[in-house]
Amino acid sequence: MVGCRAASDAAEFESVVGSSRVARVSCAVRVGRVIIGGGSPVVVQSMALGGSGSLSSDLEEILCLAKEGSELIRVAINSEESIKSIPRIVEHLVSHGFDEKMVVGCGQYEVADLLNKYPDDAAFLGKIRINPGNVGFGDKRDRNFESVIEYAIKHDIPVRIGVNWGSLDKALIGKLMDDNASLASPYPDNVVMRKALVTSALQSAELAERIGLPRNKIVLSCKTSKVRDLVAVYSALSESADYALHLGLTEAGTGLKGIVSSTAGIAHLLLMGIGDTIRVSLTSTSREDRAQEVRVCKEILQSLGLRFFSAQTTSCPGCGRTNFPYFQKLVSGVNHYIDRRMQVWKVSNPGVVNMTVAVMGCVVNGPGESKHANLGISLPGNGEREVAAVYEDGRKLCTLHGENVLGEFLEIVESYVHRKYG
């Protein structure tokens, strides 16, 4: 009886606070060193801007994405020059220690001809992405799709079938719109468009399987530019088949707007257990800024507790209770130090990516938050004596005084990393 009551209490507690993420079971797709789906960690992707007119410039951009943590990097395959550059790109990445199969070729209507004209160059690709809505037009669309799938089968290359809201097959849309119009109570147009996305993706995947591409070589995506549509489409797609799924908004925009929109959609789906690989599609302000989309992907995954890439620093926003300039300097110094040391620590102290550090500005929440972190430092607040309480694994370690509080705390951080994760 007690056991039944305990189970009931646990169920009630989970219904109130929310249980842990239950991941959808999808078919595993291997791309070089990474596995998409099958319960593997969510894979981070990006796409190179390319098109600089200088191969060396494009190579450095792609290398920058890899160094930032992109595990798969998509490049446009839209010309003879672009497909002939694939071996050079792969060679450049491999020479820096990266996977020889991390480059994904993305083509449209011209991709079938390019794959068949330059088969040896294209064979360096780890994955191919095609959009069934613009791989060709009319009868040629089906022939091109079949040609790409046959190439992938011959060279044992996985394929992402990526359907986009803005480039859906017009014949399919027309049929679904006509069917909807004949209903006594037609659905809104956006609902029909959602159905068209899912239908196009599933029909294309089924066609690829009939041609001979194994299920464990297929990844699907159905991208929209609006968060609600994205969530609705992927919810329906995830219930319809077990293909591995690639998440992302097709056009998120620039800056803060793009980051918030992408995070809202991707995080929502990941918390539902939907999604095996993600890309944040931000409009870059410069070639150097392209790696921002990789950083956002990593922050989404880390904030949800799905993957850990770096030690996490928690800090309060500051208010009238804090000595803000001093507190700001402390937060900035701790963040800068951890960022600078992380690449070294990840090699010599691999568990450090799970470390949490709290930097708090006053005694209201400072001690409590500091106790919840591996390491925490709490300032007393504005107008108080300039002392800082330091906590280690939930217990008060010491109190720092004077002008070198930051330096002394960083020494404590360094010592802790080597003791805890050495």
From Swiss-Prot:
Top enzyme category: oxidoreductase
Q: Which reaction does it catalyse?
A: (2E)-4-hydroxy-3-methylbut-2-enyl diphosphate + oxidized [flavodoxin] + H2O + 2 H(+) = 2-C-methyl-D-erythritol 2,4-cyclic diphosphate + reduced [flavodoxin]
Q: What is its EC number?
A: 1.17.7.3
Detail which positions bind [4Fe-4S] cluster: C316, C319, C362, E369
Presence of the UniProt keyword Oxidoreductase in the record: yes
Name the cofactor(s): [4Fe-4S] cluster
Q: Which UniProt keywords apply?
A: 4Fe-4S, Iron, Iron-sulfur, Isoprene biosynthesis, Metal-binding, Oxidoreductase
BP term (GO), one: terpenoid biosynthetic process
For this chain's record, the cofactor binding note is:
Binds 1 [4Fe-4S] cluster.
Q: Which Pfam families match?
A: GcpE (PF04551)
Supply the Gene3D superfamilies for this chain. Dihydropteroate synthase-like (3.20.20.20), Sulfite Reductase Hemoprotein, domain 1 (3.30.413.10)
Pathway in which the depicted protein is active: Isoprenoid biosynthesis; isopentenyl diphosphate biosynthesis via DXP pathway; isopentenyl diphosphate from 1-deoxy-D-xylulose 5-phosphate: step 5/6
What's a Gene Ontology MF term here?
A: iron ion binding
Q: What is the role of the protein in this entry? A: Converts 2C-methyl-D-erythritol 2,4-cyclodiphosphate (ME-2,4cPP) into 1-hydroxy-2-methyl-2-(E)-butenyl 4-diphosphate.
What family is it from? Belongs to the IspG family.
**Can you say what this protein is called?**
4-hydroxy-3-methylbut-2-en-1-yl diphosphate synthase (flavodoxin)
Origin species: Anaplasma marginale (strain St. Maries)
Name the gene for this chain: ispG
